[in-house]
Amino acid sequence: MMDPQIERKLIEIMRVIHESDKPIGARAIADELNNRGYDIGERAVRYHLRILDERGFTRKHGYAGRTLTDLGENEMNDALIGDRFGFVISRIEEMAFRTTYNPETDKGDVVVNISYFDKDDFETVIELISYTAHAGYMISPRVRIFEEDSLEMSLPPGKIGIATVCSVTFDGLLLKAGIPVEPAYGGILQIENKKPARFLDLISYSGTSIDPIKIFMNRTPTSVLEVLEKGEGKILANMRQINSSAYEMTGKILKKAEKVGLAGCITLGEIDEYLLGAPVETGKFGAAVVGGINGICALEETGIEIETNPISTMLDYQTMKEI
């Protein structure tokens, strides 16, 4: 039986390959693993890749790098399921740490979601995402478009990619100010009279191996279009917990973010009190943050087919344009 530590590294390498939009090489894999706290060099990665090749889990594409086979995808999904319960939170913490955006200079990297859709739907996609963002139900009205021939992203034929700002950017802004943020829940938030009323459903980040927001997306229970048209309905939102000592500082940072249009609809609760029906631990307060993909949910409600990868990657905010 192979050393559990080697098996652990094999799974992490497979995750990196899985999350890449195109074939990825050993050097890039090593760099990404180092970002995630794994001290492993390019040579060691090549050794592990040979094992994955022999098992039929990876496919080599010349000098471009490797992708996962169907067998590899299944193995990654099945392996070490117990360990993956903390993976979503670790992913959020990692991306928050990599956030470098500064509202005062309007420069730096933000966390983004990547979605793919048919070229023919381009005008509708832009119009509805813009409408949703400017109404305050997304994190930012800035997006970045990736054409089919983009060198930065591998897209299926006939598809266009769009990057939208992820709510984890909020975690990053606070972390850079020395304020740790705890991902508590993802959920469905009821909107009444254009204001947050209560959470209708919640999934704890600590109790799932899948991003709760993605779970709710797949259930398609939102009514973002009704929120936009009537001011009432259901949207996606996250709930964060923050230590009570950071209450005033959190408010100040949010105001700075709002001035540059990077906040969306964020509701801060009171210390030691439930927020919109969601429980809060003693000595902390809650922050309800709108999901960065509510515009995508609105598009799905119209019948447009669109595939989304939440918490996908980092982008320079200045390369994103307001729509």
From Swiss-Prot:
Under nitrogen limitation, binding of 2-oxoglutarate to the NrpRI/NrpRII complex decreases the binding affinity of NrpRI to DNA as well as the binding affinity of NrpRII to TBP and TFB, which leads to removal of the complex from the operator, RNA polymerase recruitment and initiation of transcription. Gene3D superfamilies: mj0159-like. InterPro entries: NRD, NrpR, NrpR_dom_sf, RNase_R_HTH_12, WH_DNA-bd_sf. One of its GO terms (molecular function) is DNA binding. Disruption phenotype: Disruption results in significantly increased transcript levels of genes involved in nitrogen fixation or nitrogen assimilation though growing under nitrogen sufficiency. It also leads to a significant reduction of the lag-phase after a shift from nitrogen sufficiency to nitrogen limitation. It holds the Pfam family NRD1_2. Keywords: DNA-binding, Repressor, Transcription, Transcription regulation. SUPFAM superfamilies: Winged helix' DNA-binding domain. Residues 86-323 are annotated as: NRD. It comes from the Archaea. Residues 11-76 are annotated as: Winged helix-turn-helix. Forms a complex with NrpRII and the general archaeal transcription factors TBP and TFB. Interacts directly with NrpRII. Plays a major role in nitrogen regulation. Under nitrogen sufficiency, binds to the nifH and the glnk1 promoters, leading to repression of the transcription of the genes. Belongs to the NrpR family. This is Global nitrogen regulator NrpRI. It comes from Methanosarcina mazei (strain ATCC BAA-159 / DSM 3647 / Goe1 / Go1 / JCM 11833 / OCM 88) (Methanosarcina frisia). The gene is nrpRI.
